[in-house]
Curated annotation (Swiss-Prot):
InterPro entries for the chain: Ala_racemase/Decarboxylase_C, DAP_deCOOHase_LysA, De-COase2_C, De-COase2_CS, De-COase2_N, De-COase2_pyr-phos_BS, Orn/DAP/Arg_de-COase, PLP-binding_barrel
Family stated for the protein in its record: Belongs to the Orn/Lys/Arg decarboxylase class-II family. LysA subfamily.
Protein name per its UniProtKB record: Diaminopimelate decarboxylase
Function of the molecule: Specifically catalyzes the decarboxylation of meso-diaminopimelate (meso-DAP) to L-lysine.
Any GO MF annotation of the entry: diaminopimelate decarboxylase activity
Subunit comment: Homodimer.
Entry keywords, A to Z: Amino-acid biosynthesis, Decarboxylase, Lyase, Lysine biosynthesis, Pyridoxal phosphate
Binding-site positions, pyridoxal 5'-phosphate: G248, E290, P291, G292, R293, Y390
Length: 432
């Protein structure tokens, strides 16, 4: 079994993360429980930042907070010197509550409301990433009404299809996101923005997908963008101060995945940008990237308590846990795969193959199919690895199941950062 970060087996024979026994965590905080290895998050963040520093490149590494957005996580991002990518008023509000520096916040989203844009402008955030003509007009209108100015990036779709799941492809031409680079939409948006008295176009942004395991797509996207930048330089006398190439850097969920180091992504992206800058006699822009999953994904582990069991002779053994698609919808949504162990006996020999069923009243609520495990008994604790991204952030109250708690662990200490929801709080907003 592959253990990430500080995860190991302790002297009790239990799984340990951040120097804390996971069985003790389950007893103290209950299950299901999201557990985050803070040291690993720090290591991942520094892997990106340090590479830019070593290369002498002016850059911003913006944590894509949609992967996992809590006050504690945003404060950790600030500690590590990151900028912040938010995609909704809710994420922006969380950042403000966390006290994150507003000048380092970048606001994304394909359908920002007037209220969300007004919030962003009121707090003078660092940059709004404009996704469409409606938004461009709306920003100009609000700025005119309030007599304020703002920085923007134009999100473009370069026509690059990254090798990933269809639902997380975003850079190809047939996408709900961004201005098309090839059909003239992006240039038209740039002309409109350059003629505005209220926006400064810092540059362009693209995001080609997620869970990407090589640099080919990023290199091709940079080439496509620079081809247009050269045309815009000649026709519009425009050169960007910022080039944001998004995120999408892959992580290891199972042995089928083969991610590359953060340093390799950064070095190959910068190498290509330098080539393009030289070829077209342009100024080197500041480079922004937006890692999310790659910062927190493998730092998260979810603990479940095993409950019932169903054996179908010669077909399958089902083992049910006290969570499921209400705390991790990715298996149902993306057919996502995970690895897991019994936290109370992680080194025990696997002597059967079981499928882990969630507790939701839904036949598709299956967390893991065909998982080799030692004999799993009721009240054993199952630890599912690499649930740090899009687990908590996509959690829901399906079947009126309360959302789990979130705990940070580091240097032998645990800290509750999100309280467990209870039935009374889950029902508090219902009007009779």
């Amino acid at each position: 079994m592959y253990f990430h970060g500080t995860t190991k087996v302790n002297e009790k024979g239990h799984l340990e993360i951040g120097g804390v026994d996971t069985i003790e965590l389950a007893q103290k905080y209950g299950t299901p429980l999201y557990v985050y290895d803070v040291a690993l998050i720090r290591e991942r963040a520094r892997g990106f930042k340090n590479t830019f520093d070593e290369l002498g490149i002016k850059a911003q590494v913006a944590y894509a907070s949609k992967a996992f957005s809590t006050v504690a996580m945003i404060q950790l991002a600030e500690e590590e010197g990151l900028s912040l990518d938010v995609v909704s008023g809710g994420e922006l509000y969380t950042a403000l509550v966390a006290g994150f520096p507003v000048h380092k916040i970048h606001f994304h989203g394909n359908n920002k409301s007037r209220a969300e844009l007004e919030m962003a402008l009121e707090h003078q955030i660092g940059c709004i990433v404009v996704d469409n003509f409606h938004e461009l007009d709306l920003i100009d209108s609000i700025c005119s009404e309030k007599n304020v100015k703002t920085n923007i990036l134009l999100r473009v779709t370069p026509g690059i299809e990254a090798h990933t799941h269809d639902y997380i492809l975003t850079g190809q031409e047939d996408s709900k996101f961004g201005f098309d680079l090839q059909n003239g939409q992006a240039e038209k948006a740039l002309q409109i923005a350059l003629n505005s008295n209220f926006v400064e176009v810092l540059g362009v942004h693209c995001h080609i997908g997620s869970q990407i395991f090589d640099t080919t797509g990023f290199v091709l996207a940079a080439r496509k963008i620079f081809e247009k930048l050269k045309e815009w330089k000649d026709r519009l006398s425009y050169e960007p101060k910022v080039l944001n190439l998004g995120g999408g850097f892959g992580i290891r969920y199972t042995e089928e995945d083969d991610p590359i180091p953060a340093s390799q992504y950064v070095k190959e992206i910068i190498n290509e940008v330098k080539k393009q800058v030289s070829a077209y006699s342009m100024k080197m822009p500041e480079i922004w990237i937006e890692p999310g999953r790659s910062l927190v994904g493998d730092a998260g582990t979810t603990l479940y308590q095993i409950g019932s069991r169903k054996d179908v002779p010669n077909v399958r053994h089902y083992v049910a846990v006290d969570g499921g698609m209400s705390d991790n919808i990715r298996p149902a949504l993306y057919n996502a795969k995970y690895e897991a162990v019994l936290a109370n006996k992680p080194l025990a020999k696997a002597d059967e193959t079981v499928s882990i069923a969630g507790k939701c009243c839904e036949s598709g609520d299956m967390l893991i199919w065909d998982l080799p495990l030692p004999k799993a008994d009721s009240d054993d604790i199952l630890a599912v690895f690499c649930t740090g991204a899009y687990g908590y952030s996509m959690a829901n109250n399906y079947n009126r199941i309360p959302r789990p708690a979130v705990v940070f662990v580091e240097n032998g200490e645990s800290m509750l950062v999100v309280k467990r929801k209870h039935m009374r709080t889950s029902s508090a907003m219902i009007c009779l």
